[in-house]
Amino acid sequence: YNSENGTVTRLVPAGRNEGEGMYFISMNLNGDIVSAFDFGTKKFVEINLNEYATPGYQPTFTSLTDNNKTPIGAIRIGDRLLSTGVYTQGRYCISQVSGDDTYSVSYPACTDPTLTDTLKSAFYASNTLAVKPTLERLACANMQTGCLDICEINGNELTRVNEVHLTPAKVKFNRHRPKGRGLVHPVNYSKYHIFGFCDLAVSDDYIYALYSGRTLKQHNLDVDKGKTILVFDWNGSHVRTYRLENACSSISYSAEENTIYALSQENNHSEIITLHL
């Protein structure tokens, strides 16, 4: 978005063809590189902000579907990609440039300990990911359940440091595939289910988590927004809470300014809320 003339330019053309994208989630900014996972094409896209306006510039796309993977989110860790998805070998997969995949860490504790790993992966499918600037730890916040998972990064494997659950889930699991070819919903959320995290931002010392705390009954399709920022240290201890005036969908942190910027979109009006720490 150009604030001077009000024009909007697509960084990635819409579509399923080469060099195009469909549905982007979990956008991250690392230096001059903006990255996001394309849920539609299962590719990880990276855009150089210093070059994107150059005629003929093309973002970098990396497919994550090799080795029969079904990814749902991803983030870069140095020269490797870390993804979550419908994985039964472990909650996290680190993919190396060589093409080798390493899975690690069990799924968080569920309300029903008898669930299969496939149902657990569906239950914890929608996540927002963030990596500590030193690349030593990962924060994974679940959008549906309010579960914050913090892991230490050891080479190509992860070790869980802490697991924070804010509220119990109000869900039903479909353990058997129905007859016919109808759409299958393995996890059904109650209208009273309290939704979890909308977005993450991190610093060397803290994890800033934008929290929804909303239900489908009260907010319908606006459950992916929140007015609360919960601050945790990298061991998972709650440090403080900030309240925002407007419901926001995403946040970012500026280390240079020690400031959080939150994006609010209410009543067809977009606004950047500034929170000086």
Where on the chain are the PLM-derived regions?
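Beta-propeller blade signature
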Residues: 92-99, 222-237, 274-277
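Flexible internal linker/loop segments at domain or repeat junctions
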Residues: 157-199
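Repeated scaffold domains used in trafficking and secretory/extracellular systems
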Residues: 19-28, 65-78, 124-128, 195-199, ...
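Blade-loop segments of beta-propeller domains
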Residues: 4-35, 39-40, 60-65, 117-118, ...
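Asp-box/WD-like beta-propeller blade repeats and closely related beta-sheet repeat scaffolds
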Residues: 39-84, 110
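Conserved blade-ending motifs and adjacent loop-strand segments that build the rim/top face
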Residues: 12, 19-21, 65, 165-182, ...
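Loop/turn-rich, solvent-exposed surfaces of beta-rich toroidal or solenoidal domains
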Residues: 189-231
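Short coil/turn segments that connect the beta-strands within blades of beta-propeller domains
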Residues: 30-32, 78-80, 134-136, 204-207, ...
